[in-house]
């Protein structure tokens, strides 16, 4: 088998290969040099054999269906040549040699004293991984070695690896329903004598018949990469189980053997945290170990980001109360010049500043003590998830208050000018801290009294914090909350006690770190350049890391003395995570200055982030411009408390109760009671949603934490009642019946999920983001999608950050979640008519944002839209006429999906540098899938179908492109295109069988009999979905369904393009004369200005043509308008001049005329004053007779050419048209000799030197000028014979010419 076949995923992934593969790489080159004719003959023979088998073996129906599928794919490959998903390479990838990785792994493991079991497990991951990047540099190899060691040596990750060893593990489920894949995996496993349960299931799906072993070779090659991936996954699982069993069980996975900070220090600044997190994310994704590993990596990175923001705020506030130190000034002003070549060979995990303890000041020790106290409280309080952002900030403020009040060394403190820091009533500075952030003083005081005091007592009782010197044995530790106590104040009364407390807290943290830690969180105040700051002097930095500059800049600790600059330095990364990208689905109401409807409405003055400031009158909260993640979070919390301030208890307000009573029906339960009972039953299982851990041995701490969880739950319920009241008021403005909403169960579940989602977002609990709450309330995303628009419309005071968060959720639902297996969207789309959604260009209409709640949560209603253009469609969707009901929400849903598709398509086409012409074709294919082939979306994402559509359209347009190029520009995760659902559902299988029946007419009955058997197999496949990569999906499913329509779209688009550029001659006006325009024949872009009844070129004079819809935007001057003319008045921008009526007029379009003629116009205008030519004298009778003879000879040609021009739209008639036009003008001059002689005046000289390809220049009409004075002076002038029609008089050979009556040959220069 070829190592690099056309559809091998090595074109997408760089695979780690052993050194022995270098000798076998020459084999693919030799095989690729075979003539294409031999391959085509081989494929044609296979097709003929398969057709014979279909005709002869009518009994084996399942086998015939499989052969038919192979025939279709093979025929498409032969006919289209490149319509298979071949990710072709123009060169061979540079592959990473395993020997290099092995040597780096051994060196790193020996330096860190890693045990052999961890090394074996890490090598197992490196052997079986697949890389997305093609980077093979030393830097990248060190990064993946570090990732493998950390995953296998960290307790949290290694415990997940141990769970893979359990028999119930479902992280690797082999594809049981693909026969080809089953045979491939069985061969691999049999060669290794691995008899697992999954292998037995695969053997059951295969048979030993020779016909199955001799299936089509090309299809096997297309599936070869998928088989290798599946085999590699099973080999990885077997290798992991083998390593774990040899290590002696799970005892090896209950302790940390590799520490992240220690690991990164080993590489001496070559790997920073920013680079490590990016590589770790990609490493886990490509190993395909499961969502648990991805979630663990996400929590690790999120924890670091949260601590980074908190430390920056802590350091900023601390040095407003204490004098800045030299180390702080050095860190903020000279960090870019820091020497990274310091001795880092010490493998201990102590911070770098321990080597310089003699240079540390008391302020430095106090700064470190405060951060270590916070780490102690944080590790005790948040044991499960990442730190709670708001709770952590309150703890930091309490610690600053604790240090400032209990520091008796007055020289260390810095009192801000004109500010009263210490509150005389309480003796603390909490009021000052609450105003400086700002935050809620009540919440801050509550945390200080109930939470921080408990942990400060624990520190003192365990002798971690010492009250005074060791020589003093006074044991006064009981009343530590009394700030006036001498014992408390003696904690930081001299330098020796400060150093002892620092050492004690440092040792306490080290014990925790070696037992549970992931990142050494002391690096923030130690400012370890080997880990925390990007090394600018590293010459081995690979260009691939430049893509993560925004992350690297964020991890740089660029602090400034100026607080505003300090806040703005670290916004690049974290602020982008707080502000999700705008979605093209739901229109944003923040773009307008007014808001209509209920829920507040009116004009709202918003700041630059869209947070309303009108309703936040208490303290003018909305006027605070958020600049940092902390200030953004506090602003959201303030908005939330103002929003629910009327709901003191988790019960409906009086206003809501009165509204619900009005909806009560006789002899039924009160709506208020039903509401309270429903909320209570749905939220019973939400007590643990805000779990923040705690100390098991202290009942007081558990009670305090339970209060925090209950308080946040109550806030979510209060917000639910607040949003419900707004929605009901909004509905009452348009309809008096609100029972539809009150009795809809999904409506209440969606509203509760929305309320809990807001609470989780306000407090930055990312582990509880969507789709956590819809799973808790057992709600489908399609139902939850209905409420997002209503909340964004009704709640006018919703901050922009929350609106963007819900827009991002909406986009996720439209991309992935709405197309799940149990979604009702497929049957809903099938039962609705969408003919009037798309306009004549196939583009979706504007998204409707005026849907009422009852329209969203209701049954479909009859369509009241009488659109006269309903039946005019560009896209042939073949929608049946049976549906008679429509739901406005479903129509709006289709518009949103189409808008998302066109936005993604345009972005991707632009990134690939392709023409915008591809967008129309790709969009039509996607709309066809959305309306008629909706089942292709099932269990798949929009990105998968969009990539396949782009690839297919590029191929039919003869554009060489690869899947790898499209995937690289789409920036999707590896999981999206590696784990695509391959199984055919019921309808797809029926359609495939019908296609096979059309191709094999002799076996129609036999194939139809087996449809039921195939449907039963598909129902079994839904339980264990078959997954493969995007190339297998493209060849096996996408092409079989969409191939005919792709060619139809391409052919229609080509016809439209040809029709657009080949304008019919009957729509063009005749050559007309105008006194105010330069002479020109047959303009390229013409706006009809003449009644077609008088058009001699129009064969049908009885029915005048309508005006063209594409009116040029350029001005048109001097158009002659008679009573028979009709033109859009907006086109003309200058008044019409009076002139002698003639039989025709002419329009000259300036903006759309050739630039050469515009240059000639300018030349003539410049010569008009100084270069005036004398008009010719009256023509002699001989010349008149001469002209008459010429005209009589060409009369027949005139009639014939006129007919030709009216019937044929051909460019070859241009010369005939010129002759006709010239002869017509000659006829006019000969028939009206006396009149023409008086009208002939001065002529403008035009220098026509156009190419022979533009015949219009050879016979352009002259411009008449009614000047009587000049006419009288022209009688005495002579002119050469104007009737000379010799070729020598052609304008191509003369620089300038003019004549009163010239023939088609040209004109001569006038003489005085």
Swiss-Prot record:
Induction: In the growth phase, expression is correlated with several factors that lead to preference for the spore pathway. During multicellular development, expression increases 200-fold in differentiating spores. The keyword Transcription regulation applies. Residues 1-67, 168-231, 336-359, 536-611, 987-1023, 1168-1236, 1249-1312 are annotated as: Disordered. Residues 10-67, 219-231, 337-359, 536-595, 1185-1234, 1251-1275, 1286-1305 have a biased composition (Low complexity). Residues 198-218 have a biased composition (Acidic residues). Disulfide bonds: none annotated. Pfam families: DUF3452, RB_A, RB_B. Its main location: nucleus. Residues 168-179 have a biased composition (Polar residues). Disruption phenotype: In shaking culture, leads to a higher density, a faster dying after reaching stationary density, and, after starvation, a lower spore viability. However, shows abnormal slow proliferation on bacterial lawns. Also leads to hypersensitivity to the stalk morphogen DIF. It is found in: Nucleus. Residues 180-189 have a biased composition (Basic residues). Keywords: Cell cycle, Chromatin regulator, Coiled coil, DNA-binding, Nucleus, Repressor, Transcription, Transcription regulation. GO terms for biological process: cell differentiation; cell fate commitment; chromatin organization; G protein-coupled chemorepellent receptor signaling pathway; negative regulation of asexual reproduction; negative regulation of cell cycle; negative regulation of G1/S transition of mitotic cell cycle; negative regulation of transcription by RNA polymerase II. Residues 36-117, 195-230 form a coiled coil. GO terms for molecular function: RNA polymerase II transcription regulatory region sequence-specific DNA binding; transcription cis-regulatory region binding. Belongs to the retinoblastoma protein (RB) family. Key regulator of entry into cell division. Directly involved in heterochromatin formation by maintaining overall chromatin structure and, in particular, that of constitutive heterochromatin by stabilizing histone methylation. Controls histone H4 'Lys-20' trimethylation. Probably acts as a transcription repressor by recruiting chromatin-modifying enzymes to promoters. Plays a dual role, regulating cell-cycle progression and transcriptional events leading to terminal differentiation. In the absence of a G1 phase, functions in late G2 controlling the expression of both S-phase and mitotic genes. PANTHER family: RE32990P-RELATED, RETINOBLASTOMA-ASSOCIATED PROTEIN RB -RELATED. This is Retinoblastoma-like protein A. It comes from Dictyostelium discoideum (Social amoeba). The lineage of its organism: Eukaryota, Amoebozoa, Evosea, Eumycetozoa, Dictyostelia.
């Amino acid at each position: 088998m070829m190592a690099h076949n056309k559809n091998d995923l090595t074109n997408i992934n760089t695979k780690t290969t052993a050194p022995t593969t270098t000798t076998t790489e020459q084999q693919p080159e030799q095989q690729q040099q075979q003539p294409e004719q031999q391959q085509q003959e081989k494929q044609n023979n296979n097709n003929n054999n398969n057709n014979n088998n279909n005709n002869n073996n009518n009994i084996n129906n399942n086998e015939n269906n499989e052969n038919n599928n192979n025939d279709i794919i093979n025929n498409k490959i032969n006919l289209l040549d490149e319509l298979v998903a071949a990710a072709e390479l123009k060169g061979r990838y540079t592959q990473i040699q395993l020997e290099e990785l092995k040597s780096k792994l051994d060196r790193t493991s020996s330096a860190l004293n890693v045990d052999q079991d961890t090394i074996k497990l890490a090598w197992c991951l490196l052997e079986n991984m697949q890389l997305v990047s093609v980077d093979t540099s030393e830097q990248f190899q060190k990064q993946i070695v570090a990732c493998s060691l950390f995953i296998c040596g960290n307790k949290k990750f290694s415990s997940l690896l141990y769970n893979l060893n359990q028999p119930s593990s479902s992280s690797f489920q082999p594809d049981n329903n693909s026969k080809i894949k089953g045979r491939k995996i069985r061969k691999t496993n049999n060669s290794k004598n691995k008899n697992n349960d999954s292998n037995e299931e695969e053997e059951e799906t295969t048979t030993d018949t020779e016909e199955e072993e001799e299936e089509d070779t090309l299809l096997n090659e297309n599936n070869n990469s998928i088989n290798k991936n599946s085999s590699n996954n099973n080999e990885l699982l077997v290798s992991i189980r083998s390593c774990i069993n040899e290590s002696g069980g799970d005892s090896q996975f209950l302790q940390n053997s590799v520490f992240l900070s220690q690991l990164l220090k080993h590489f001496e600044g070559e790997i920073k945290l920013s680079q490590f997190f990016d590589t770790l994310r990609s490493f886990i994704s490509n190993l395909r170990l499961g969502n648990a590993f991805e979630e663990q990596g996400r929590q690790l990175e999120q924890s670091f980001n949260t601590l980074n923001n908190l430390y920056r705020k802590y350091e900023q506030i601390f040095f407003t109360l204490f004098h800045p130190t030299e180390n702080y000034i050095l860190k903020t002003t000279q960090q870019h010049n820091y020497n990274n070549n310091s001795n880092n060979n010490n493998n201990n995990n102590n911070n770098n500043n321990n080597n310089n303890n003699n240079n540390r000041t008391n302020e430095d020790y106090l700064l470190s003590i405060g951060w270590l106290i916070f780490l102690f409280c944080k590790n005790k309080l948040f044991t499960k998830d990442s730190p709670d952002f708001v709770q952590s900030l309150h703890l930091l403020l309490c610690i600053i208050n604790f240090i400032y009040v209990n520091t008796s060394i007055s020289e260390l403190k810095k009192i801000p000018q004109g500010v009263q820091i210490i509150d005389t009533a309480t003796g603390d500075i909490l009021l000052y801290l609450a105003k400086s952030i700002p935050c809620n003083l009540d919440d801050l005081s509550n945390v200080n009294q109930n939470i921080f005091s408990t942990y400060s007592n624990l520190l003192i009782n365990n002798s971690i914090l010492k009250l005074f010197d060791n020589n003093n044995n006074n044991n006064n530790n009981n009343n530590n909350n009394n700030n006036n106590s001498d014992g408390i104040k003696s904690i930081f009364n001299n330098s020796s006690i400060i150093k002892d407390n620092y050492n004690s807290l440092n040792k306490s943290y080290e014990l925790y770190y070696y037992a549970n830690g992931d990142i050494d969180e002391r690096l923030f105040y130690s400012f370890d350049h080997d880990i925390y700051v990007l090394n600018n002097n590293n010459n081995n930095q690979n260009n691939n890391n430049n893509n993560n500059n925004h992350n690297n800049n964020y991890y740089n600790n660029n602090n400034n003395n100026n607080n505003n600059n300090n806040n703005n330095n670290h916004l690049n990364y974290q602020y982008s995570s707080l502000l999700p990208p705008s979605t093209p689905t739901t229109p944003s109401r923040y773009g307008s200055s007014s808001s209509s409807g209920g829920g507040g409405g009116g004009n709202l003055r918003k700041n630059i982030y869209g947070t309303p400031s009108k309703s936040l009158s208490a303290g003018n909260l909305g006027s605070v411009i958020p600049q940092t993640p902390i200030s953004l979070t506090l602003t959201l919390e303030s908005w939330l408390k103002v929003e629910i301030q009327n709901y003191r208890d988790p019960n409906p307000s009086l206003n809501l109760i009165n509204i619900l009573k009005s909806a009560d029906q006789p002899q039924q339960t009160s709506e208020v009671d039903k509401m309270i009972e429903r909320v209570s039953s749905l939220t019973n299982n939400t007590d643990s949603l805000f779990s923040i851990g705690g100390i098991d041995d202290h009942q007081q701490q558990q009670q305090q934490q339970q209060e925090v969880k209950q308080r946040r739950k109550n806030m979510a319920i209060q917000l639910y009642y607040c949003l419900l009241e707004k929605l009901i008021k909004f509905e009452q403005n348009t309809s008096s019946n609100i029972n539809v909403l009150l009795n809809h169960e999904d409506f209440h579940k969606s509203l509760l999920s929305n309320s809990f989602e807001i609470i989780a977002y306000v407090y930055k609990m990312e582990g509880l983001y969507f789709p956590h709450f819809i799973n808790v309330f057992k709600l489908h995303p399609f139902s939850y999608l209905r409420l997002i628009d209503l909340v964004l419309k009704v709640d006018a005071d919703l901050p922009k950050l929350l609106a963007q968060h819900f827009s991002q959720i909406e986009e996720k639902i439209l991309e992935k979640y709405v197309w799940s297996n149990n979604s009702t969207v497929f049957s809903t789309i099938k039962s609705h008519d969408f003919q009037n959604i798309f306009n004549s260009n196939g583009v979706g209409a504007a998204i409707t944002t005026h849907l009422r709640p009852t329209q969203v949560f209701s049954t479909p209603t009859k369509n009241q839209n009488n659109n006269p253009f309903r039946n005019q469609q560009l896209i042939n969707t073949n929608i049946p006429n049976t549906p008679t009901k429509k739901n406005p929400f479903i129509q709006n849903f289709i518009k949103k999906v189409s808008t998302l598709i066109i936005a993604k398509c345009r972005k991707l086409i632009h990134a690939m540098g392709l023409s915008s012409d591809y967008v129309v074709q790709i969009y039509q294919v996607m709309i066809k899938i959305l309306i008629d082939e909706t089942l292709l979306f099932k269990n798949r994402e929009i990105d998968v179908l969009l990539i396949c559509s782009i690839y297919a359209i590029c191929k039919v347009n003869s554009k060489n492109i690869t899947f790898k190029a499209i995937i690289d520009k789409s920036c999707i995760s590896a999981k999206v295109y590696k784990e695509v659902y391959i199984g055919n559902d019921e309808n797809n299988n029926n359609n495939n069988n019908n296609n096979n029946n059309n191709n094999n007419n002799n076996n129609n009955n036999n194939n139809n009999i087996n449809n039921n058997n195939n449907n039963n197999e598909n129902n079994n496949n839904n339980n264990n979905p078959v997954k493969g990569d995007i190339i297998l999906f493209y060849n096996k499913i996408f092409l079989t369904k969409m191939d005919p329509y792709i060619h139809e779209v391409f052919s229609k688009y080509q016809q439209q393009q040809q029709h657009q550029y080949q304008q019919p001659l009957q729509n063009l006006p005749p050559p007309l004369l105008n006194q105010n325009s330069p002479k020109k024949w047959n303009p390229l872009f013409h706006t009809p200005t003449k009644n077609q009844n008088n058009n001699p070129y129009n064969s049908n004079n009885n029915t005048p043509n309508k005006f063209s819809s594409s009116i040029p935007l350029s001005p048109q001057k001097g158009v002659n308008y008679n009573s028979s003319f009709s033109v859009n008045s907006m086109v003309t921008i200058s008044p019409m001049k009076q002139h002698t009526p003639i039989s025709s007029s002419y329009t000259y379009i300036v903006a759309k005329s050739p630039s050469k003629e515009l240059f000639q116009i300018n030349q003539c205008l410049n010569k008009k004053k100084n270069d005036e030519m004398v008009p010719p004298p009256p023509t002699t009778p001989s010349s008149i007779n001469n002209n008459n003879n010429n005209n009589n000879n060409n009369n027949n040609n005139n009639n014939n050419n006129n007919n030709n021009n009216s019937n044929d739209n051909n460019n070859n008639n241009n010369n005939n048209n010129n002759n006709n036009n010239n002869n017509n003008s000659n006829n006019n001059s000969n028939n009206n000799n006396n009149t023409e002689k008086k009208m002939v005046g001065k002529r403008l000289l035009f220098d026509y030197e156009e190419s022979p390809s533009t015949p219009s220049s050879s016979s352009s009409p002259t411009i008449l000028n009614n000047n009587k004075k000049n006419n009288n002076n022209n009688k005495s002038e002579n002119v050469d014979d104007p009737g000379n029609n010799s070729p020598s008089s052609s304008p191509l050979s003369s620089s300038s010419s003019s004549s009163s009556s010239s023939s088609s040959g040209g004109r001569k220069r006038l003489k005085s």
